Amino acid sequence: MQNFIEINNVSKTYGTYKALNDISIKVPKQSIYGLLGPNGAGKTTLIRMLNQITAPDQGEIIFNGEKLNRNHISQIGYLPEERGLYKTMKVGEQAIYLAQLKGVSQKEAEKRLKYWFKKFDILSWWDKKVEELSKGMQQKIQFIVTVIHEPQLLIFDEPFSGFDPINVNLLKKEILELRDKGATIIFSTHNMASVEELCDNIMLINKGQKILEGSVYQIKQDFKDHSFEIVLRQQDNKTTRQQED
């Protein structure tokens, strides 16, 4: 399978702090690639490089066969973990404005936005001010704005934060549909259940070092024997056992 993103021997240092140390990964085209790791592992630095907010000290990033450059910015949609909308603007007005910043004409933006608003059953929010919406409602708007210019690469950083289970399932369905329609997706999270459900391939990173990388299926096969049994002794001397992976 052709790789859409190739990160080759990338390192980044801030002062004496090594944020990334000789990282190499390959993200197959039209796949969902999971970035896993604790806070401070290096996931955000990697995402910032893909968005060209910062540059590697060494190594290179290949974007769809070309060395990453400014022309690729319009082909990326990024939903950061820290989100924010202009509170006093109307929802529809702001969504059109943000779509135009991504190169979509006003007429086309309104057409695409109305499609997504109907799909998410939120068309009634169009003329409301952002400050009238709950956090979860605002995050739906930001998800829509992230995908509105139909980018080739989507980067989602903890996209389910703040959502109830119903809306989490709604977004999971949309993410899978976006992949099936041709998008390549990088999904940064701490949630292993979501990784198993959504991701084709993953990388586990910690302290700027790659710990493991591969397909979710292969990693599960490689580590399937890593289990243990917990024996719980109750006061009535009955014994219960629980199998853990």
Summary of predicted features, one role per range:
Residues 59-74:
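Conserved ABC transporter NBD signature motif
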